[in-house]
A protein has these predicted regions:
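Extracellular Ig-like/FN3 beta-sandwich strand-entry sites
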Residues: 120-124, 180, 244-248
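Short edge beta-strand/loop segments characteristic of extracellular beta-sandwich folds
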Residues: 57, 69-78, 182-190, 198-203
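Bacterial N-terminal signal peptides that target proteins for export
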Residues: 1-11
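Aromatic sugar-binding surface patches on proteins
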Residues: 107-114, 229-238
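N-terminal edge beta-strand
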Residues: 38-65, 159-177
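Short acidic/polar inter-strand loop motif in beta-rich domains
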Residues: 131-138, 254-263
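Low-complexity, Pro/Ser/Thr- and charge-rich linker/hinge segments at domain boundaries
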Residues: 27-32, 147-168, 270-275
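Sec/Tat signal peptide C-region and signal peptidase I cleavage site
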Residues: 20-25
Length: 275
């Protein structure tokens, strides 16, 4: 039997990996993405090594296209000298491909964002990190889902409107000062896309959805978001913040009808929070 040359084997494996990466890069270059990139990131390039900056978790096939869980994970913590300034969420095949733009600061501690989204058709989902120095890094996942944006909202719209704008904060365990703490913001809102037909009246319900979210701690912004109906009914966001001392965690939300909602919770070292 002829001995296998380890150098040739390594070279062959490297060529296979490079070819696979090139094929994947071409595969993700859809016409819609090219238009979004030219409109939002014209003249800017994407840096290599994105998996050392940002990752994206999403199911390969969604159980419910109107409620698809995603987790955007920042590999490194937020430091004043190097941090993720913005995260762009793009779903190529959605009616509104640029579904969300999250703005973060060093006071976020970590730039992780977890939420639930609607996906209208089989699509590439993209999480793009913009660093404080302007460099761009992109993570992608292909998700098989259909009909999420045109699916009707909850069955009882009257009850949903009665709860409109009610919000609640929750933290996991006792809050640790000077450390990134995970918090969750739950918003009661039908987030009507305007794309779902009423099967009885055959009419489309007018759109009404959350447009902006701003979360601050002790008066300093830790996370803000410009969003649309890409976010699922009853928007839910999990994010981090770093409390330097006891203070107030506050959320201000505005929807597409210019209705404004607020909630806040007192944060005390060692105690959990729930508003």
């Amino acid at each position: 039997m002829t001995a296998i040359d380890p150098i040739r084997l390594a070279a062959a494996l490297l060529l296979v990996l490079l070819a696979s990466a090139a094929a994947r890069s071409q595969e993700t270059e859809t016409d819609i993405w090219r238009k979004v990139r030219e409109g939002q990131f014209a003249g800017r390039s994407f840096e290599p090594g994105a998996d050392q900056v940002i990752t994206l978790e999403a199911p390969n096939r969604a159980e419910d296209a109107a409620v698809v869980p995603i987790l955007i994970h920042a590999v490194q913590s937020q430091q004043p000298q190097r941090f993720i300034k913005k995260i762009y969420l793009v779903i190529d095949k959605n009616p509104s491909p640029m579904g969300a733009v999250f703005t973060l600061t060093p006071d976020s501690g970590r730039a992780d964002i977890e939420t639930r989204i609607r996906i209208e058709d089989y699509s590439w989902v993209r999480a793009i990190a913009e660093m404080q120095d302007g460099k761009l890094y992109m993570a992608t996942r292909y998700v098989k889902a259909s009909g999420g944006c045109s699916a009707p909202a909850g069955k009882d719209m009257e009850s949903a409107m009665a709860r409109l704008g009610k919000m609640k904060f929750r933290t996991d365990g006792g809050v640790q000062l000077g450390e990134p703490n995970l918090a969750e913001l739950m918003i009661s809102h039908p987030n009507v896309s305007g794309l779902a037909m009423d099967q009885v009246t055959r009419l489309y319900a007018p759109p009404r959805f959350v447009r902006t979210v701003q979360v601050s701690y002790a008066g300093k912004t830790v996370m803000s978001a410009d969003v649309d109906f890409t976010i699922s009914e009853n928007p839910n966001f999990r994010f981090y913040f770093v409390p330097r001392a006891d203070g107030e965690l506050k959320a201000e939300v505005v929807d597409s009808s210019n209705a404004t909602f607020e909630t806040s919770v007192a944060i005390r070292s060692g105690a959990g929070a729930g508003s």
